[in-house]
């Protein structure tokens, strides 16, 4: 599975800044959860872009994604920051969300599958049940070997 969504740790329990803010030059949204969520994927310049493709534990995109080209062999679900694509590429306090944070996002948000015809774009609008703020997760194609397979019209993709 490919994850490019990112989160940013919260330093205090009481947050008073605006709903959309920045960490190290990248915007985030406070969904009222334990971490702040990026408005776009690593490697994207707009929320509707897929961003870069990363293998788990690798910090640079590559041209081929096969078992032979995979360099990260650890089986941990939480990456050391030196192997975290968000931290290495965006700096600051950015990092890939851990499984508990992903579950929190799933359980505390409404997920609406959407299609934007003028952009030919499928994805999920993820809206907080806590404060009504949202992020958009485009359903990206799946990169296998050196080929990209479109799977966006079926509601699944790589995140």
Residue ranges and their predicted role:
Residues 4-7:
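C-terminal motif of bacterial Sec signal peptides marking the signal peptidase cleavage site
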Residues 12-159:
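Conserved positions within compact, well-structured domain cores
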């Amino acid at each position: 599975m490919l994850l490019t969504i990112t989160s940013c740790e919260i330093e205090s329990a009481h947050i008073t800044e605006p709903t959309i803010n920045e960490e190290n030059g990248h915007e985030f949204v406070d969904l009222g959860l334990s971490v702040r969520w990026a408005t776009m994927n690593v490697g994207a310049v707009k929320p509707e872009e897929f961003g870069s493709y990363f293998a788990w534990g690798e910090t640079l995109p590559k041209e081929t994604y096969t078992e032979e080209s995979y360099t990260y062999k650890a089986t941990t679900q939480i990456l050391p920051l030196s192997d975290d694509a968000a931290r290495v590429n965006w700096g600051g306090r950015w990092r890939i969300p851990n499984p508990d944070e992903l579950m929190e996002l799933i359980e505390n948000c409404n997920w609406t599958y959407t299609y934007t015809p003028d952009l030919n774009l499928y994805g999920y609008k993820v809206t907080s049940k806590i404060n009504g703020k949202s992020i958009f997760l485009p359903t990206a194609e799946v990169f296998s070997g050196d080929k990209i397979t479109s799977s966006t019209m079926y509601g699944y993709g790589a995140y």
